[in-house]
Amino acid sequence: MTTARPAKARNEGQWALGHREPLNANEELKKAGNPLDVRERIENIYAKQGFDSIDKTDLRGRFRWWGLYTQREQGYDGTWTGDDNIDKLEAKYFMMRVRCDGGALSAAALRTLGQISTEFARDTADISDRQNVQYHWIEVENVPEIWRRLDDVGLQTTEACGDCPRVVLGSPLAGESLDEVLDPTWAIEEIVRRYIGKPDFADLPRKYKTAISGLQDVAHEINDVAFIGVNHPEHGPGLDLWVGGGLSTNPMLAQRVGAWVPLGEVPEVWAAVTSVFRDYGYRRLRAKARLKFLIKDWGIAKFREVLETEYLKRPLIDGPAPEPVKHPIDHVGVQRLKNGLNAVGVAPIAGRVSGTILTAVADLMARAGSDRIRFTPYQKLVILDIPDALLDDLIAGLDALGLQSRPSHWRRNLMACSGIEFCKLSFAETRVRAQHLVPELERRLEDINSQLDVPITVNINGCPNSCARIQIADIGFKGQMIDDGHGGSVEGFQVHLGGHLGLDAGFGRKLRQHKVTSDELGDYIDRVVRNFVKHRSEGERFAQWVIRAEEDDLR
C-alpha cells in the first residue's frame, strides 16, 4: 500500500518563509528599486520633459508612492472600464492625494491647499473618507512646485498611495473632546516621523491602513491596524489593539487582539504589527495580499503569539474592550471643547469642496481667531477653537459657502467616492450624482424627516472596491453596468442594505438580483425609507429592521 505524500505548501511569497522571488508584476516592480526613489526622476526628468517622457512602470506603479494616479480620460462610459482599455482611459493628468495624518491642519495649511487647488487643479478639491485631500487635473510639470508649497506648511503626499502605510486616521477632536479616553496625537505624529517615507515599510504586500483615536470616531473596524481608547481597570487609560479590517471585494471586520497598549508604546507596537504584515503577508495574489487574509488564516491567537515572540520580544498586557457605539460619531454641529471654546463641524456633500471654498474657510477662521481645522473620516470638516461670541458669525459664513453645521439627514449621512468623473476603475457616476441626489432626497422626504430619529447612511461607490464603504452603510450602492432591458447596458448599482459599525457591527444584506439604474436612486431610497418608517419598531435602527424586513419592502 502506497502512502500519499502530503501536498507541498504553495509559495505565497511570504518573506519570513524565504519566499523572496517576485510572483507578480507589482512585486517585480518593487524589487527592481525602491518606489520612493521615483521622486528624483519626477523632479529632475519628468517635470521638465513632460508627461510623454514618463516611463510606464513609473507612471502606473511607482508614482503611487508619491500620491499620484493618472485620472480617467473624459468621454468614456462604464463599458470601457477595465485593464484592457487602460491606454484609452489614462489621461495626461493626475489625481494627487495629500495626506493629512490625524486630519489635522493649521489655517495656513488650509489656505495653501486652497491656493494649490485654484492654481494647479482647476479649483478641484475633495475631502476623502480617510481625511485626505484629493486634487484632479494635476500636470506633472507642476508637481515639484506643489510639493514645495506643501512642505512649507508641514504637508506631504509621501506614501499617500501604494503598498505602504497610508494616512493615519485620528479623531477630529483629539486632545479637545470631552468624551475621549486619552489624546493619542503624539503617537500619530511619532509614527509619521519615524516610518513614513522610510525604507523599512516602503515595500509592504499591499496597502496598509491605520486608525488611532481616543474614541470610536475613525471607523476602526475597517482598518488593517487600529488603536482605540479604553480604560484598563488596573493600568488606566490606554488603547485597545485591533487588526485585520478592510472592505473591497472581500470585506472583513478587524478583530481585537485582546491587548491593552499604553500610549507611549503605540509606535513600537504599530511597527511590530506592520513588520508581521511585511514579513508574513501574502505577495502572490494582489487580491489576497491585505493583512486581513493572513489574520483569517492564522487566527488572532497565532498572530498575537508571533507578534509577541518574534517582534516585540515580550508579552502584551491583556485588556478590556471599549463599549461599542450605536451610531457613527461624525462631529457635525457645534460641540464644546475641553479648552472652553467650540468646534463647528460642517458637511459638504460627499466631501466635495474646492480651492475657492477652502480659502474662504481659512478667511473665516482668521476672523474667528482659529488656527486649527480637522478633516474627518466621514468626508466632513471641523473648525476648532471658536469663542461663543463669534460662533453665530462663523456659522453664517459657512452656510453662505454651502457648508452646513445643521444639515439634513441626507446631506449629513451620504458619502461617495470619486466615481467615473475621474476614476479609471469606476463604472458609474457617484460624487457628481450625489450633488443632485441630496437636494432631491431633502425635497422628496421632507414630510417624514421629523420621524427619523436615527441616522440612515447612504454610501455610493462606482466599483466593487468600496472606497466609499458600501458594505457598512445602511443603504450602499455598488456601481456596475446593468441590463437596460433592450439588449444594451446602462450605468447602475447593486444594492446593499443594513451595514453597520459599532454596536451590532456587520455587513449589508445584498438583495438577490436587485439592481437600480443611476436615474432610479432617488426613487429607490424614497421607497425603502418610507417602508422603514412604516414598519419599524420603536427605537429600531435601520440595520436592525433590514434583518427582519420582508424582501418586498426592501426592493
Swiss-Prot record:
There is a cross-link at residues 69-161 (3'-(S-cysteinyl)-tyrosine (Tyr-Cys)). Coiled coil: none annotated. SUPFAM superfamilies: Nitrite and sulphite reductase 4Fe-4S domain-like, Nitrite/Sulfite reductase N-terminal domain-like. Binds 1 siroheme per subunit. GO terms for cellular component: cytosol; peptidoglycan-based cell wall. Keywords: 4Fe-4S, Heme, Iron, Iron-sulfur, Metal-binding, Oxidoreductase, Thioether bond. [4Fe-4S] cluster binds at residues 417, 423, 463, 467. Catalyzes the reduction of sulfite to sulfide, a step in the biosynthesis of sulfur-containing amino acids and cofactors. Belongs to the nitrite and sulfite reductase 4Fe-4S domain family. This is Sulfite reductase [ferredoxin].
